[in-house]
């Protein structure tokens, strides 16, 4: 699986996003939903999710929260806040969400469109006591339920091709195409030749065929 950025920065990213949300709610007195909307609208979420070194490593969660407000042109009254070791539900939300975004390389917007931030914070109990992979599996199930079609099926349909026609044109076996579209075979592990022929026929990039969310059974 291709992750959003180097794992070297993951721990820092989780801490920063968790602290940002905790600080925004408990010190800046924003609602979780409103503040995360600002995070998305300012473009900082996209930068963070793509591994922007300045945001992942160069800022603390508190600094990131202030930057969101500044970018959104909201009033900012900086104050010195003592570090707290408390781990609120909002902190866990940022911590877990940062991990999931890194793991799947989905954008934060794509994630929130399927599972709103209010629903994620509501998962604090019981998921904060579980291994993070159980949270990931649950989020993946939600995402796949909301997006049942694979990228291959979506691109094939857009091109106006049947499975049989795509197989005839590309030389990829019909059964293999069916298995990719049914998620019974992982297209991310497909032969390079298959991916190249499919991308040429469907007028897309090879990476457009890849799946960011894979069923846990795979």
Predicted regions and their residues:
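Short, basic-rich loop-to-helix N-cap that marks the start of a DNA-contacting helix
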Residues: 57, 184-197
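Conserved hydrophobic/aromatic packing and binding residues within compact polymer-binding modules
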Residues: 152, 166-167, 177-180, 209
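N-terminal interaction modules that seed assembly of large macromolecular complexes
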Residues: 10-67
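Short, charged recognition helix plus adjacent turn
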Residues: 210-218
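DNA major-groove recognition helix of helix-turn-helix/homeodomain DNA-binding modules
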Residues: 65-73, 192-208
């Amino acid at each position: 699986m291709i992750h959003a950025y180097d794992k070297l920065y993951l721990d820092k990213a989780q801490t920063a996003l968790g602290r940002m949300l905790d600080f925004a709610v408990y010190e800046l007195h924003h609602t979780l939903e409103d503040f995360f909307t600002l995070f998305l609208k300012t473009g900082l979420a996209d930068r963070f999710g793509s591994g922007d070194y300045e945001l992942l490593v160069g800022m603390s969660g508190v600094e990131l929260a202030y930057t969101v407000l500044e970018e959104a042109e909201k009033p900012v009254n900086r104050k010195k806040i003592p570090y707290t070791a408390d781990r609120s539900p909002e902190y866990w939300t940022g911590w877990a969400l940062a991990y999931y975004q890194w793991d799947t390389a989905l954008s934060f917007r794509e994630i929130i469109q399927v599972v709103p931030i209010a629903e994620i914070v509501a998962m604090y109990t019981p998921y904060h006591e579980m291994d993070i992979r159980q949270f990931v599996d649950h989020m993946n199930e939600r995402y796949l339920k909301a997006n049942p079609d694979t990228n291959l099926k979506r691109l094939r349909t857009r091109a106006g091709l049947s499975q049989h026609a795509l197989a005839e044109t590309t030389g990829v076996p019909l059964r293999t195409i069916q298995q990719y579209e049914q998620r019974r075979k992982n297209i991310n592990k497909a032969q390079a030749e298959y991916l190249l022929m499919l991308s040429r026929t469907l007028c897309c990039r090879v990476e457009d065929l890849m799946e960011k969310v894979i069923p846990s059974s795979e």
